[in-house]
Every structure is written in structure tokens, then in C-alpha cells.
Amino acid sequence: VRALGFFLGAVLVAGPAARAQNGDHAGEEQPELPRELVVPAAPALSVEDEAKTFRVPAGVRIELVACEPLVHDPVVCVFDADGSLWVVEMRGYMPDVDGKGETEPNGCVAHLFDDDGDGKMDRRVVFLDKLVLPRAIAPTRGGVLVIAPPRLLFAKDEDGDGVADEVTVVDQGLGGIQSPEWAINALLPTLDNAWYCANVPWRYVWKGEKWQRERTSAAGQWGATKDDVGRIYTNNNSDPLRVDAISGVYAARNPNMGNALGVNLRVVDDMSPRPARMNVGVNRGYQKGQLNGEWKLASVTGACAPLVHRGTGVGDEYRGDAFVCEPTGNLVLRYRLRDESGAVKGEPVRNPDGLDFLTSTDERFRPVWMCDGPDGALYVCDMYRGLIQHRLFVTSFLRKQVLARGLEKPIGMGRIWRVRSAKGERAKAARLDRAEVGDLVSALGSENGWTRDTAQRLLVEEHDSSAEAHGRLRGVAQHSSSSIERVHALWALAGMGGIRKELVHSQRAELQHRWPGGIKDPDTRVQLAAVATSEGLAATDPDVLEDWLDIARNPGGGSGKLRQVMLSLGSVPTPRGLSAMMELLQTSAQWEEIRSAAVSGLGGRELDALNAIADSEEWRKPGPGRAELIALLARCVAREARGDRLEGLIGLSAGKMAATKWQCDALVSGVMAGRPKDALGKPTWIRLARKPGVLPEALDAAFAWPGKAGAEEAKVRDLTAEENARFEKGRVLYEGTCVQCHLASGLGQTGQAPPLRSSPWVLGKD
């Protein structure tokens, strides 16, 4: 091996200069590996030999579930209610180092079955084929949702032969062919009965007997997961774990403000992996800091597919921990999560030998997806190949190694592994496809997250009109001793249209005689779920709204309850809802996350809130955070740039707020912050249709109107035919690739992609 490694090192140095690659940066040097470096060979191994390369903690074992020819190039696997395994095969991914033939329709959805119950798959049925780079699947409503670029499909087997007969296009124009790793993926079932997708600012919900998009904040690159209380976790290649502490639906609902605080938050500060082998085959291994002194990966560069493990099959000490795939480092990382007053933080947990949770000395071990199974174990999709980097980013440095070391072949392999406790026999897998209503409701109390999630899904999808299901779920929501079971029961009822006042609201006298349940539940997690699920009641029922205010005024245990109530008040578009919000803000505006939560629900009503402040004697007094709240509201009105509201804002500054200097100053600062920017990124005019009747001097620099001296509008000419053709080509490219990261608004995503709108780099002359 040493002689072979030396020979390969020599080839890498002496070989002809590779042609420029998509991943090369202009003017960047890519130093060769040292001539004397011994690079271990990386032949394709049998499953038996690959298994010998794994290192896991004592007390944990790894077992084969499926391999070629039952599975090829697996990128996603999920279990259905009957214990069968759905596998998405991206067989067109990188056929060679240049990606030639990548768009051939050779991808498929395979359905694997363990016929004899021994834990290994025995049978493969191709459910759906002739797909281009498919990337996600979710069993639902008797079929499966499949992301097959550029479409989202719903496929169903109607005649029982295991092959899709009925295929419906649910959505299209999704992109994903040009850049597979930067496109919509995941299809994660959420606690609130939706389907979350990474990399795009929407999710899918079943509403009105059809699938619909629902706006949410965008995050993540490949994969998504959730914890027991429904928080969504994502990551990107260089940041192993991020979390939405609040629902992205709340965060994204006011475009005038932008995303509310509390989404896409960093969880992990330590980005270093601990591999078992050198990783010189990483794409930018030539860059300083990419590899350490042992030529091992120093910082994650391929982090993907996070999983919060919610099963019991690996061991109690692992439940609730986050696991992250790192295929470029040939490993799976593990993080211990802790909740610090609503903020989730994670610390890496290493094995006694100093390595990460699951490592391999096989360079072709490529973990790209994980899921929990019906037996409580953790399952890993191993794409098993030498080349994992996509052609859009391959550098000359990597290309040389791929060709010299034969890493591009063979392709079409793949393995799925089970990680479980080494103590005793494998736990029996739950099977819910034939479960009666009572059994499904009981399954909401399972210790395994997969079982709870699947039971909830089946109740919502198949028993939404069942009186028995509604009755049993109400009993669980109010009387179960398990708080997580009560949470699932509430969300199941919400998905079935079964939230009623008596479920979430308790009369004061009743509290002395029975378990309170609902909004007055003793467990914060249940209280938050009760508030969120009762949003449809609060607009018309003052008792429910008063319950919200009670726990917000006396939150206890941190500000989580107050923030949830503030978020939920945004769904009550009534005068009472607004007055309740302003009442709470009188004593809570000092917290930025509370101000943000409030304004997230005031899209189009920011001026109403400002008028409420101006009309209130209590708000005349300055206090912590009050000026910042006024500025934020004014900024939203300025950014929306709607003529009637801008006139109202100007009138407010010249009228009701004029006598209260601190209020007027805050309003002006918000307007100035909300001005649009020019091509150089400098603030410019907010344009009005006509000159306002009264304009405070402090706002003169913010507004322009026809005829204002020095504020003439630039004349815009029509595009030429050639320019229009280029524009259309760019539009298609942006919609197909760039929009996934930079969004349709061009505002980008925190921790993922910088803003392009008003960017000097985009609009400047240089």
C-alpha cells in the first residue's frame, strides 16, 4: 500500500495540468500534495470488507440492511407504515468527473421489503422510474410525494402490483437539475401536519382536498429534521446544524419586515470533525485550514442530512442527540443538544478514541442521509462512491486525484446500514398500516418518534371524520400522563379540524378538580401547542384569548410562552387582537425577539399599530425597546412603499406623534432605515405620487415626488432584442439555480447566501 500511495502521489504531481474546472477561482493557486505523502488506496470494497472499516462506540453495532443489486446510488430512505423502505436513487449523479450524462432519466424510486423479518431487505420493486436526479420522498395519503426535478409528484399504486399507476403533478418549476445540492429537497413531515422542504421559502400542506404551497422561511442545503417539540433543524456544507426556534411560517409572514428573529439559528460552534482516515480527496484540500497536519478534514465541508434521533434502538444516551452526515470526511458526527431558555445549543460528542460517532477508513463510504426506523434504530444511506463532489464545484486539485486514483468508477453501488444497540436482539419493528383507531391513538405515547409521527399522520389522513378518533384524542390531550403524547394529540386534532374550546380552555373553578390540560397545562410544551392549535378560536372567543394573555403576563420558565402568544396574536386580525398585542408590548418591548414576533404578525397593519401607540397615554412615556418598536413599524411601512400608508405615516409624524419627540424621532429613524437602495447600495428616495400636504423637515430627505428639485427620476429605455434575450436567459438560470439560495426577493438567507438586491457587486459598473 505504501508503494502504491507513493506512486499515486507522484502521479498527482507529475500529471499534465488539468483543464480549468467550474470550481476553480480565478487567480487562486492550488498547491499539489507533497511528493512524499502516502495516500492510501481506495478500492471498491464488498459489503463485508466495508463493514470492517467502521468504528462506532462500544455498545453500538452497525448492520447491513441492503446493498447492490437491491439498491443503487441511494440518496434518501424513509420507512412506510408497514415497515417497508422507500429509497430514492439518484443514479444519474456524476457519471464521471465532468458529469456527462447527468440529466439522463435513469433515476428511480425503489420499494424494499423485508419478507422474512430478519432485518435485511429481500425484495426490490421499482415503483417509479425514468426520473432525472430525484431527491426526496414521503409516504402520505396512500401513495408517496416525490421530488423529481423540476416537479413535485404524487404517485400511487392503484392495482396492487407495487408499481405507480397514477402520477399527478403537484407542483412544477422547482429547479434541481442544474445544481442538485442547491435545490428543493427533504419533504419532512412536521408536527403541525405539513411537509417541510429544505432550500426553498415554502412548504406543502394538504388543504381543500389538494396540495398547496405555504410560505415559510428558507433554510438548509440538503436534508432536514425535527425534535420532539417540532423545531426544525437544517444545515449547510460548512455549518453542521441550525435550528428554527419558532415556526418559519410565523417568521416569513410579513415581507415588509423580512424574516422574524428565531429562525436559521446556529446551534454548533465547533465545526471540526474527527475522521478515521486522511481526507486529501476533499475538493479544496489545498486551501489553508481545510486539512490538518495529519491530512484529515479540519472543518466540515460536506455536512448534510441532519437527524435528531428520537428512537430507543441505539440507546437511551443517544436519544435526542443530533447526528450529521459528513460524506467528504467519511463519517457521521454526533452532537448533544441542550435547551438554554429556548435557545438550542449543541456540543460534539466524541468516542473514547477521539473519533466521531461513526467513522470509516474506506474513502468510498459516503453517508448522505439518515432516518429513524420503526424499530427505533438509526438508518444510514451510504451512496458508496469515490467521487461525491458535483461538477459545478469540482476543482482542478480534485479532478487530478479522481483520475489518478480511479475514484470516478465504479458507480451504481450503494448500501443502507442500521445502527443499533449491541445489547440484545434487534427490537421488533412497529407496524401501523393495519392498526385500528385505538391502537393509533395509543401509539402517540410510544417512546419512538417514528411511531408517534406515523400514528399522527395516519390519524389525520385516514380518520379525520371518525368520532371515535376525535373522542379518544380529546381524552389523551386532557388526561395522558405523557406531555409529548398530549402534544401529539393536540396537533392530530388540529390536523383533523377537531380543536374545540373545551379542549384548550379550562374554567377557573375546574382547575381545582381535574388535570387542567390545554392552555393551562402544567407542562410548557403542551401550553405552547395549545396556544398554537387554538389560533382559529381566539379571533372569535374572548375566553381563549384571555387564557393566552394569562400565560403571557405570567410566563414563568423564560419568555417562550410570551413569544408564542405574541406570534399567535398575529393570527388574530381583529381590533381586540391588536389591542392585546399592544398591551403586552407595554411591558415586553425591551426584548428584541418579542418585538420581532409581534411585527411578524402585523403585515399590512403596521400603521394601525403606530396609530394605537400614538393614541395611548401609556405609550407617551419612553421605555426600554419602545423607540425600537416604533422604528421597526415605520421601517415596514416605508419598505412596503404603498402610497396611502406612506401618506398616513407622514401625517402621523406631523400630527399625533409630533408633540412626543422621542416617538417622532423613532418614526423618522425607521423611515430612513426603510429607504430603498441604489445600484451602489446607498439609500435613495421613497417615491410618492404627489407632494404631501405637510412634510416634517426631518423626513424631507426620505421622500421624493414629481417635480421635487434634485430628485428627478432616471429615464428607463426599453431593452433591445439582444438585451431582452439575455434577460430571459438570465431569468431562467436564476429561477432554476440562484433562487434556491438568494430567494426570489434577492434578499438572500442568513448563514447561507448574501443579498443580491441592491448589491453593488450586482448593479455596480465594475
Descriptions of predicted regions:
Residues 305, 377, 415, 492, ...:
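C-type cytochrome heme c attachment motif
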Residues 723-747, 763-766:
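Sequence/structural segment immediately N-terminal to covalent heme-attachment motifs in c-type
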Residues 5-15:
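Bacterial N-terminal signal peptides
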Residues 21-440, 450, 458-461:
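Beta-propeller domains with acidic blade repeats across secreted/periplasmic ectodomains
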Residues 381, 406-412, 419-733:
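Long, ordered, helix-rich scaffold segments
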Residues 402-404, 479, 748-766:
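Gly/Gly-Pro-rich "capping" loops immediately C-terminal to redox-active cysteine motifs
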Residues 1-3:
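Positively charged n-region of N-terminal signal peptides that target proteins for export
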